[in-house]
Amino acid sequence: FSDEVTNKKFIKKNKKFLGYYSFSNFKKRIYYLFNNILIWKYRKKSSSFIFRYYRLLNFQDFPIKMKSNKKKFSFKNFLIKLYVRLLSINFILFLIKKILNNKYFLNKDVSVYLKKINPDLVIYPTNAFEPLVSEIPIICKLYKTKSFFLIDNWDNLSSKSILINHPDYISVWGKQTANHANKIQNIPQKEILIGGTPRYDIFFKKEI
């Protein structure tokens, strides 16, 4: 589990619990900036990407007039526009991905846990945006383990960013999200499973 979870006392009661993983604020920032580059680079894949980009700029230059998007110079926005355009150049983007995928940059906590238990499959629930989502597929390949993502919400694959590394398999809510996985994230259909969501299971129980 991430060290940011809230119910740690309950988690520690599980005898199979191995421990937490963590990310430094610096590394979180790196992935945040990289995701901003990706939403600009692949903005034509989803209208939600370009909306997220404008939100990053406080809706400056947004096509629809809003109180917060009046034409005024913002040095912060200027820097954002500059770095997303410059770093989204194919060659530079390739180099950044190479660095992020380097085994010396990967999460050490997760690597230690996988080496210790040597699993056949790693099942990872995700919103498709946090730093570890980019590292799990690479770490699993290093230890010759299959990776399986459980996507947390119906719009995560169309509204967050682009997955720079694909898992071996991915489970989604329904047909719409399966289409997002294939068309937006370029995940082959044979690797996409429609698993639904456990959030609604309680409504089908006789007693609530």
Question: Where on the chain are the PLM-derived regions?
Answer:
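Short N-terminal targeting/anchoring amphipathic segment
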Residues: 111-130
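Short, charged/polar "capping" segments at the starts of alpha-helices
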Residues: 4-10, 131, 177-181, 203
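Structural motif
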Residues: 1-4, 23, 125-128, 152, ...
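A nucleotide-sugar donor-handling region in carbohydrate enzymes
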Residues: 101-103, 151, 165-208
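Short, flexible loop segments at the rims of nucleotide/cofactor-binding pockets, characterized by
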Residues: 97-102, 124-127, 147-150, 207
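Active-site proximal beta-strand in glycosyltransferases
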Residues: 121, 125-126, 134-153
